[in-house]
Regions:
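A short glycine-rich, Lys/Arg-flanked "PGG" loop and its adjoining helix->strand segment in the class I
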Residues: 158-176
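Conserved structural core of kinase catalytic domains
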Residues: 374-438
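Boundary detector for helix-to-coil junctions that initiate low-complexity/charged tails
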Residues: 549-568, 674-744
Length: 744
């Protein structure tokens, strides 16, 4: 047993060596934990641009548990704590935290990063050995990304059930087990993400046919395990995009709404395929009340009794400058009534949250001019508390109209609110102020723009609720006291609706910006203003999504590839040229549709045709001329610029293939043609095989001719040395000139 800072590291059950390791990267992570303070981890992540560093040191990892209703008195057991990515969330809320992990190196990383905590103890060793020595009873036992390894922890016929039975022995009577795990049926896996643990496509959704040792589960499968382990009551939450980096956590009491699930950048660690547009599929799933079955991850709280908490929904906005990091919760009381609260995630953001109340009070009379109403807000000790309102957002309504094909109606509705914003914020001449420049930069906007004070720049469709007889503005966090151009607020309304979801692109060719009076020059300037605002909001913080292109192996857009290949097939034509005495000319040709597999067609032959040329276009693998005949006249003679592969097959090496028929019979009326496209790989292989064979045959012929030549030369040389040849040379006339001279 030893201490790192204030942290107790108990190695009583440690076997002397780590049974699993990620290698040298763990040494690097240990150095980071030793030498870098937690408030600088984000800077290191930005510098390293490494998946392991991001995964183990990102503050977003703590979002999965930092919302839990800890009172500061709870005793928590964290099983499989690893490098401590989630441990900090427990230390921030609970009274005592005990960690168990098999790896000494990872436990040291955990200890170093939390060395200032006086309420952390880490037990290093195999779980089955360590748990036998546990004497405490715990309020919470957490399994964050651990339960799926039950087969490795427990050697039994039913390891996952037995795992929970063993854990249960260490719970207080009213204690809870908290499990975060991937959903085997998570939509991201159907859409082309690889299985998280094995890195293979579709392994989980097919039931793990090729792998062993790790298993994730569906809702039904987990409920069955919970029941068999002792009749646990379960409360379900759904972290999005997943439990590893959750920015929103839904529950059965507050499921996602249409348009909310539009983030697909999950794959920081592995290449993924993109088989379909997930946001559109999510909307369809939501329409059919199937979201829990297809959520990417689960966060399940189980116990002898139901987990009681008012929190029904959690949204983190903590990828910002610490001054602006907040948490939004929807809470439900036992009587069913709801309220919303916004909390600072740290002391530096307290002023920002308090400011929300002040802005709401100031905006109320302004918005009422356009029959918009601010949901009531009050200051409380922990932040602000807001009224919970029912209805659908303007964003949802617009999406519904698009789904129904009512594009004109959607445009008209959108412009109703654009005009409201223009009237609200177009009352005075705009002029850049120092405060404006601090937030939006020196924009260089054209003269003559109108603007307004108390500018709620987040007056976007997602934040406008269409209620019964009243429209409500739900979020006015980003409201500024200085003058902002009305067109910029309108630009953001359009931009954040049109650009945040691919299914809304059907409106993009309607020139909505121009119709709203926002010139192209303004659009370019507003885009730069928005970038400057985002920099102001995040400060020196490096958001995880900004690193996607540098860390992630990326996506393969299968639909784009499919459309391209299908398009090639749809556009492929057989062009037939007829030479009627003026050679082949474009005006004397016809085009016939041709599929990727080929074609079978009867081609009428115009009178007077002397020659024909058939151009099938690019055929990567070449083709087989299965049939080429004159009707009633027999097989048609032809030649081609392709390489003959045998059996009427020809390869063109990616060139422009041509089939030429010379001497077309005068009586020819119909040419029957059947082409069959060859598979490229097979054709290329056969081409090189035949090419090599022909080259070898030619080389052999050349060598044979050289040998014959050498033999003839030897024969000549031998003949020249005979007496007869020498006598002949003496008697042979010297030539015509010599003979003539003698005759003279």
């Amino acid at each position: 047993m030893r201490k790192i800072g204030n942290v107790i590291l108990d190695d009583t059950c440690y076997q002397g060596r780590d049974l699993y390791t990620d290698g040298a990267i763990e040494d690097e992570m240990l150095e980071i934990a030793r030498n870098v303070s937690p408030d600088r981890f984000n800077k290191v992540i930005g510098e390293k641009k490494s998946w392991p560093i991001l995964y183990h040191f990102s503050h977003i990892r703590e979002n999965i548990l930092s919302w839990m209703p800890f009172t500061g008195k709870e005793k928590v057991l964290e099983i499989g704590s690893g490098c401590g990515a989630v441990t900090g969330a427990l230390l921030g809320g609970a009274g005592e935290v005990t960690c168990i992990d098999l790896s000494m190196k990872r436990s040291e990383i955990n200890a170093w990063r939390h060395r200032d905590s006086e309420k952390l103890k880490i037990l290093v060793g195999n779980f089955q050995d360590v748990e036998k020595k546990l004497t405490e009873k715990y309020d919470y036992i957490t399994l964050i990304g651990v339960f799926e390894y039950g087969e490795a922890y427990i050697q039994s016929q039913d390891p996952y059930v037995d795992f929970l039975k063993i854990i249960r022995k260490h719970l207080k009577p009213d204690g809870k087990i908290v499990i975060a795990i991937e959903n085997r049926f998570g939509l991201k896996y159907w859409a082309g993400c690889t299985e998280d643990h094995f890195g293979t496509l579709f392994e989980g959704i097919q039931g793990y046919p090729s792998t062993k040792g790790v298993k994730t589960f569906t809702v039904k499968e987990l409920k069955k395990i919970f029941q068999e382990a002792g009749g646990f009551e379960s409360t379900w939450y759904y972290p999005f995009p997943d439990y590893k980096f959750p920015m929103t956590i839904y529950s059965d009491r507050r499921l996602p709404r249409r348009g909310e699930l539009n983030r697909t950048e999950y794959n920081f660690d592995r290449l993924r395929m993109e088989l379909f547009q997930e946001s559109a599929v999510y909307d369809s799933i939501l329409d059919n009340d199937l979201y829990p079955q297809f959520a990417n991850s689960f966060l399940v709280v189980i116990g002898q009794d139901k987990f009681e908490t008012e929190t029904a929904y959690i949204k983190y906005s903590n990828e910002r400058d610490p001054r602006f990091n907040i948490l939004t919760q929807i809470c439900q009381k036992p009587d069913g009534s709801r309220y919303v609260q916004k909390l600072p995630t740290g002391s530096k953001a307290e002023a920002h949250v308090s400011n929300i109340y002040d802005k709401g009070q100031a905006l109320a009379p302004l918005f009422e001019k356009e029959k918009l109403y601010v949901n009531s807000c009050e200051k409380v000790s922990y932040g602000v508390k807001l009224e919970y309102l029912e209805g659908i957002s303007l964003e949802e309504k617009l999406d519904t109209l698009l789904k129904e094909g009512q594009l004109d109606e959607a445009e008209s509705l959108l412009f109703t609110y654009l005009h409201k914003a223009e009237r609200l914020y177009g009352s005075q001449d705009f002029k850049e102020s120092p405060e404006f420049i601090q937030v939006f930069g020196q924009a260089g906007l054209p003269e003559g723009l109108k603007g307004g004070m108390l500018a709620d720049i987040d007056l976007v469709p997602a934040n406008i609720l269409l209620g019964k007889g009243k429209d409500w503005v739900l979020d006015y966090e980003w409201t500024f006291d200085f003058c902002v151009p009305a067109h910029f607020i309108m630009y953001r309304m359009l931009h954040y609706y049109l650009e945040s979801d691919g299914k809304r692109h059907v409106l993009k060719n309607r020139d909505l910006y121009e119709k709203a009076g926002i010139s192209r020059e303004e659009q370019e300037i507003y885009a730069k203003m928005e970038q400057h605002f985002q920099k102001y909001m995040v400060g020196k913080h490096i958001p995880m999504l900004s690193l996607y292109d540098e860390i992630s192996p990326g996506k393969l857009d299968v639909m784009e590839y499919y459309d391209r290949i299908r398009g090639c097939g749809d556009e492929r034509k057989l062009q037939v040229f007829f030479d009627r005495g003026q050679d082949f000319q474009e005006r004397d040709s016809f085009k016939y549709p041709m599929t990727r597999r080929g074609l079978c067609i009867d081609i009428p032959v115009p009178a007077g045709t002397r020659r024909m040329r058939l151009d099938p276009g690019e055929v990567p693998g070449g083709f087989k001329i299965s049939r080429i005949r004159w009707r009633d006249l027999g097989r048609a003679a032809f030649h081609t610029n392709g390489f003959a592969l045998g059996d009427h097959c020809y390869y063109f090496g990616g060139g422009d293939p041509q089939i030429i028929l010379e001497n077309v019979p005068r009586e020819a009326e119909i040419l029957t043609l059947e082409l069959e496209a060859l598979k490229e790989q097979e054709a290329v292989k056969e081409f090189w095989s035949r090419f090599a064979r022909e080259e070898n045959e030619k080389n052999a012929q050349i060598q044979d001719l050289k040998a014959q030549l050498k033999q003839k030369e030897a024969q000549i040389h031998e003949m020249e040395n005979t007496k007869a040849w020498k006598l002949y040379r003496k008697l042979k006339p010297e030539g015509k000139g010599a003979s003539s001279k003698k005759q003279e």
